[in-house]
Amino acid sequence: MAKFEIKDDVAIIPEGTTEIGEWFFARDYLSLKSVTIPESVTKIGPNAFHQCTSLESIVMPLKGIKEIGYSAFTGCSSLKNIILPKSVTKIEESTFNNCISLKNVNIPKSVTEIGWSAFSGCTSLESISIPESVTKIERST
């Protein structure tokens, strides 16, 4: 990934970056509070933000991201809301597993499948919009 800036626990990923790699923020940036992802990013790798327990805000573009890897946000216990890009077609297994503060999820019409345990352990979930385009929801979700 291209060089990015973190200031006051806020990461701004530069335009031109196409992928956030597997486990990228998971091990070294646990105090990260916010991340802004540009439209050039098409893939968020598996476990990219795994256990980033301080992460409160993810600003994603409305389009661009096509793939969000399994367990990408597992254990992000401070995350409250998520609006997925209109270009995502599948919510992978355990994507938001144990995001215990997650209250609202907006799933776009482009999504056709929700993987197992995608929202397992999201004990504060108040609202989730599942469009008619979703034809498969795996068990334990």
Which residue ranges define each predicted feature?
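Structural signature of tandem-repeat unit edges
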Residues: 2-19, 29-43, 53-67, 77-90, ...
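Consensus positions within tandem repeat domains that build extended binding/scaffold surfaces
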Residues: 21-24, 45-50, 69-74, 92-97, ...
